[in-house]
Regions:
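Gly/Ser/Thr-rich phosphate-binding loop
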Residues: 314, 342-346, 355-422, 436, ...
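Single conserved hydrophobic/aromatic residue that forms the stacking wall/gate
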Residues: 506-516
Length: 516
């Protein structure tokens, strides 16, 4: 039975989306000032956009806030502390757990105290090399609570990759676990971390390791300490007030050679933009159940497992499993059914894997997905066959949208919370409010509809995008802003059709860099 959203796909659209989009492009400061009223500030910004030093733009420059406060404390303060913040489900281990906003704040405050006891102060870098467990989310939010800059590295990444990130970030502390689990095998983290520490020129002060049950490892005191031990000796601590343009995190892009490329996120713009996206792009409200099936080591995990859903006050699902093999091709349907998930965000690869294992959807028929309203795909090209297969099976809108590690949120999408637009197979829909997207041809002129070229975004980029690279302003300028003056180069090619729909030819490593 088609949902309300799917029915609206068949009707004539009003100009609601166009009005909002046009306003965001013509009056960006007013548009984002309005959005900024929806988050908590210790000191509200009066300077909305500083354009004095392009391409280094600053949003909400004089604002003072805190990422963790907006993710947790604000909801507890508003009387929603008993609402479920995080659902953890691990079909690999059989472990399940729910955490209310109150409980999660308590755990985060305690681990923030533990980090402080290990000498971590505002501005210090903390590397988080963890599997998909609640402690990984706790570590990220604890860093945000005290103003430390986290750098999450995908658990299981090779020692040399981890070493290069230790060296570039000059991290003070590394937080890890004894192991991660893949279907049919255990990935021992300690030897990988030990190898990285040995290879790195910069020496970390401490390693905090979470011992997974049945997979405990020996720690070498005093540099290596257990999670449980440091938490038992810690007190809960409050949020530190942070300037809007201080950094929330560094996320290194994968697959780079030489010095890793550290994408940074400024605090104020990050909170404002991500909270705005939950309702406007994904049609998710406070208390809704949201699931992003990605990994916290990638940008989708940062933005849509951890930060955006918690900023919005909804319930986010943390899934330690795979689309197939944990235990079967019904794993996703089971999660959606068990927790009454409203929307899922994942990569097309996941659905191709499910389709290959269960082309007729036999597993699907075992579960109740009556609360499920929409599926969002990103990270690589969503081929029309996969989209149509998912639409026919799920009977909900299947929305392909496009974004990058650099942007932290969608450049183009069907904005279901504003107005559902017609699907065009092979397109990632229209540019999202905030992004003035153009196609530039090889002769450096702006393309006409349906003409191919490089996809660029007119500067300034909206809040929540990367203001620079970690300790590499010149590289930021040269890599992204120099080929087309006044524009951000996405390094994707494509065309925009006569209706404003963006059609992409993805870069070869897009799936690696966006979603994994």
């Amino acid at each position: 039975k088609p949902t309300k959203l799917l029915k609206s796909n068949q009707i004539n659209m009003s100009d609601k989306f166009k009005k909002i989009y046009d306003n965001s492009i013509k009056n960006p400061e007013n548009f984002w000032q309005e959005a900024s009223k929806d988050i908590f500030w210790f000191k509200k910004p009066t300077k909305i956009l500083n354009k004095s030093n392009p391409p280094f733009y600053k949003w909400f420059e004089d604002g003072v806030t805190n990422t963790c406060y907006n993710a947790l404390d604000v909801h507890v303060d508003q009387g929603n502390g008993k609402r479920t913040a995080l659902i953890y489900d691990s079909p690999i281990t059989g472990n399940k757990n729910n955490f209310t906003y109150e409980e999660l704040r308590s755990k985060v405050s305690k681990f923030a105290g533990a980090l402080k006891n290990q000498g971590v102060v505002k501005g210090d870098r903390v590397i988080i090399y963890m599997p998909m467990i609640p402690e990984a989310v706790v570590a990220m939010l604890a860093c945000a609570r005290i103003g430390a800059i986290h750098s999450v590295v995908f658990g299981g990444f090779a020692s040399n990759e981890l070493a290069s990130r230790i060296d570039d970030s000059k991290a003070k502390v590394l937080v890890t676990a004894s192991c991660g689990f893949e279907p049919g095998r255990t990935v021992e983290y300690k030897p990988l971390v030990d190898g990285a520490i040995k290879q790195a020129n910069h020496k970390i002060d401490k390693m905090i390791l979470f011992q997974r049950s049945g997979h405990e490892v020996k720690l070498n005191a005093p540099k290596e300490v257990s999670w449980d031990e440091v938490v038992s000796n810690a007190e809960e601590i409050d949020c530190v007030e942070m300037k809007s343009n201080e950094f929330a995190y560094i996320l290194y892009t994968s697959g780079t050679t030489g010095t890793p490329k550290g994408i940074v996120r400024d605090i104020g713009g990050h909170i404002v933009a991500l909270k705005w996206t939950m309702k406007n792009i994904y049609n998710i409200n406070e208390g809704d159940i949201w699931w992003s099936a990605s990994d916290i080591g990638w940008i989708v995990g940062h933005s849509y497992i951890v930060y955006a859903p918690l900023f919005k006050g909804c319930t986010t699902v943390l899934f330690e499993g795979k689309p197939v093999g944990t235990p079967d091709a019904g794993a996703f349907w089971k999660i959606i059914s068990d927790y009454k998930v409203k929307s899922l965000f994942t990569a097309p690869t996941a659905f191709r894997a499910i389709k290959k294992e269960d082309p007729d959807g036999k597993f699907f028929s075992k579960y109740d997905l009556s609360k499920f309203e929409s599926l969002f795909l990103a990270g690589e090209r969503a081929d029309p066959d996969t989209i149509k297969w998912a639409e026919n099976l799920l009977k909900v809108p299947v929305i392909d949208h496009w974004w990058q590690t650099e942007t932290s949120w969608a450049i183009s999408s069907n904005c279901t919370g504003i107005e559902m637009m017609k699907t065009k197979y092979g397109s990632a829909c229209k540019a999202v409010p905030g992004y003035d997207v153009k196609i530039i041809k090889s002769d450096k002129t702006i393309a006409k509809p349906n003409e191919m070229g490089d996809i660029v975004v007119k500067l300034p980029l909206p809040p929540g995008t990367f203001p620079t690279l970690w300790n590499a302003d010149e590289r930021y300028k040269q890599n992204y802003m120099s080929n087309y003056e006044g524009f951000y180069q996405t390094y994707d090619a494509g065309h925009i059709d006569e209706d404003g729909y963006i059609c992409l030819l993805y870069t070869s490593d897009a799936a690696d860099d966006y979603i994994r």
